[in-house]
Amino acid sequence: MTPLRRPRRSRLLALCVTAMAALPLVSASGTGVSAAAPAVTRAPSPSDGDGPEVLRDRTVPLALDDFRTLCTGVPFGAPREWTFDFFDNARLTAVEDGIDDDGGTRTWSGHVKGRPDTSVIVSLRGVCSTGGTQPEGTVVEVVADLGEHVYHLETLPGRPLRARITEEDPAKQPHHAPDELAVSPSARTAPRHSLAGRAAATSQNPAVIDVIAGYTPLAVQRAGSAQQVVNTIHWAERKMNEALADSGVPASIDIIGTYNTGYTGNNTSSVMWSKLSNPNDYELGSTAADLRRRYGVDLITVVNSVPGQSSGQGSLPVRGNFDDSLAFSVVDYDSLTGWYNLGHEIGHNLGLFHDRRTLSQQVPDGSWVNDLNTPYGTGWITSDEEHTSLMAYASSCRQPCRTENVYSDPGLSIYGQPLGNESNDNARLARLTTPIVAGYRALTVARTRYALTLESSEGGSVRPAVYGPYKPGTVVAVTATPASGHRLAAWIYDGRQYGPTEQVNVTMDAAHTLRAVFIEA
């Protein structure tokens, strides 16, 4: 059984920020690379004062220039490091795992040095632009999730620029009601189609699901600006791709564009999903249908704002019947970072169901069993009631528990607790369904993507932090894992030999080949 490379714990509270002033929150590492203090601004919370999850806070000046080293190129080799000082007794060094560039947003991903089960995210918009003036809509997003505690920074309104830093206990965040099972009555009586014999996604042929993401004016109001919403959407994109990779699913989503829906009606997720799914609905559905037709994307998701309600809704194929009309999801803005909800709602588009306890509460007569796409396509709550998979609900735990950013898989464990069994294995199902959903439509616009061919000799294996093919400029971390009695001897990158380090980072400026060479220890 494989322990999680990064068990994503509970709520990764990513926050958007509008700018920074002079706080060297991040200092240079031994690599000679320096970075800056993160500053984040989230939606000015309407009246939400601090909840019980906030343990302490402080306000500091911020400086934008310190972040610009994150805009520099990344050479092949061992990952770079940055040190963050959140409080006098809270300093951490983060190891670089990847960089994604999406329509002007650069998202830096990493983990705490020596703690691959943690996550540190820095997202930049407008910071890497050249010139002496600060562009409008500059956004920085930063979060450090150590599991039991989460640190984040949030910019405050006004000038000079200042930021609020908080330490939070995610276990004290309030639970939200499960989303409804978005299944039509006719689908429940349709003939069953077996997925047996379907070609699964593989590391040699990973699936890419193309997505366009919309958002509502209420989401913009909640976030503070449209740029902050877009920033957080790309943060959530990275998190879902990590969830797929960490669950052994060779697939990814690619959000090729975003748009403001202009929708000012009821933001309740079930209402919006019904409208979004209807191509004749003039408020949401007709625009979504037109975007799919024009761009050839597989899925449409829309970010709304419904504090205190069900945090999303996603089209759910049932009984093995996948159809490109089942291509829509609605996700609450706060839930994107609160509990990885983009991966949950799009997980429904992949045919993945909740955990069995939640399903039994939602459908007490047990008829949900007949809707499953495979007998094992359900989420998981660990036997110690402390962790759930991405499709399960913490509200169904019998004690406070954390949602991990992975799909149920009996081959994964956290703190010795299996994250699935043979009857609850959403990752296995996703390996079958991601190629189906990726084949709903074919892109009608040019989209350059580069392949990274990974190889290894006998005696070990390699895997990327997220699967490709990759957009130009993406930085991908690749990790080597020796088998028992073996060790890593060298990396061969595009025909050149490099020394052995457990992790190397590759910049996808072209197609590349990387091979790990293992020898007996």
Task: Please annotate each region the language model reported.
Residues 1-8:
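N-terminal secretory signal peptides that target proteins for export/translocation
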Residues 13-15, 20, 25-147, 278-280:
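N-terminal prosegments of processed precursors
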Residues 39-43, 51-54, 164-320:
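Fold-level signature of zinc-dependent metallopeptidase catalytic domains
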Residues 258-275, 323-408:
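The catalytic-center signature of Zn2+-dependent metalloproteases
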Residues 410-449, 514-519:
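A recurrent domain-boundary module in secreted/ectodomain proteins
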Residues 449-454, 502-521:
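Conserved "repeat-terminator" motif of extracellular CCP/Sushi domains
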Residues 453-468, 497:
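Short, solvent-exposed loop/edge segments of extracellular or virion-exposed proteins
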Residues 474-502:
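Surface-exposed interfaces of beta-sheet-rich extracellular modules
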